[in-house]
């Protein structure tokens, strides 16, 4: 006996469990606070278009630049720090083309670049910076953020 199309058992679809969306406006201050607590000098990097008091449009900042710029101290007996560019995104956010270009330019210039979307990403970034500090002080455990800079 042949089954008709409607009689066949259809495979059940798995429902995606929706993760709670974390907005960039929550990620950014948490990232700044974590970097500051870790000893970094932190600056919120604003960019965009402003309307002046006289009505003129004024473009500020570099297009695609990271949300946070920071200097993370390494302390090698002299005042030495790592320059960081941190892009904060919502939990589902992605880098735009101009942000990818900025990331490439920052890495080429010797900066460390991180994309942060959650508390886990913030913790991983701080851990990576601590590994960089230890490596620069003589540890054999080179962190990924520095390995990316050293590759030809």
Protein language model features and the residues they cover:
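Catalytic phosphate/metal-binding cores of nucleic-acid and nucleotide-processing enzymes, i.e., regions
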Residues: 1-152
